C-alpha cells in the first residue's frame, strides 16, 4: 500500500467479509467463480470461524461468529459485509508504529497469534476514516535466506 510517497506498507492479502453463516456466503460466492482455499479455521481469541476463498477477484476471508461472540455484530447490524483490508508486512511492530504516527490510526487489536495464519501474529487498526486494516506478520519460511552465503554472479 503506497500513500503520499511513503514506503510500501505491505502486500495485499485479502478482504475480510462478515457473514451470518459461512456456508450460505460460500454458495453465493461460488456462483461468482470462487472456491475454498485451505481448511476452515477457528480463532477463539477473536471469536470467529473463517475460511479463505479465491476466484476471479481478490482473495476473500469469510467470517462468522463463534458461539455467542459479538465480534462481527457492528458490521452485520450496519449491513456492511466487507469490513477490513489485510496486508502482509515484514515488520509488524514497525508498521503499527507507522500507522499510529503517520495516520493517527487507533490500534484495535495488538499483535496476537492467529490460527488462520499458522500462528503468525496479526494486528488490527482503524484509520481516521474508520477503515479497518489488518496487518499480518510475513511468513518468514517463505522469505529468501538472508544468511551470509556468498553472492553468486
Question: PLM features: residue spans?
Answer:
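Conserved catalytic-core motifs of GNAT/GCN5-like acyltransferases
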Residues: 36-44, 112-114
Amino acid at each position: 500500500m503506497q500513500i503520499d510517497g511513503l514506503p510500501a506498507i505491505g502486500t495485499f492479502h485479502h478482504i475480510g467479509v462478515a457473514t451470518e453463516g459461512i456456508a450460505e456466503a460460500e454458495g453465493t460466492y461460488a456462483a461468482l467463480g470462487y472456491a475454498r482455499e485451505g481448511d476452515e479455521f477457528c480463532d477463539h481469541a477473536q471469536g470467529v470461524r473463517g475460511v479463505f476463498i479465491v476466484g476471479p477477484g481478490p482473495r476473500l476471508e469469510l467470517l462468522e461468529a463463534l458461539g455467542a461472540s459479538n465480534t462481527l455484530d457492528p458490521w452485520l447490524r450496519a449491513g456492511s459485509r466487507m469490513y477490513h483490508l489485510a496486508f502482509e508486512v515484514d515488520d509488524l511492530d514497525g508498521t503499527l508504529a507507522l500507522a499510529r504516527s503517520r495516520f493517527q490510526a487507533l490500534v484495535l487489536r495488538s499483535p496476537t497469534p492467529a490460527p488462520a495464519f499458522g500462528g503468525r501474529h496479526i494486528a488490527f487498526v482503524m484509520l481516521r476514516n474508520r477503515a479497518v486494516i489488518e496487518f499480518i506478520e510475513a511468513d518468514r519460511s517463505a522469505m529468501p535466506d538472508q544468511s551470509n552465503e556468498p553472492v553468486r554472479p
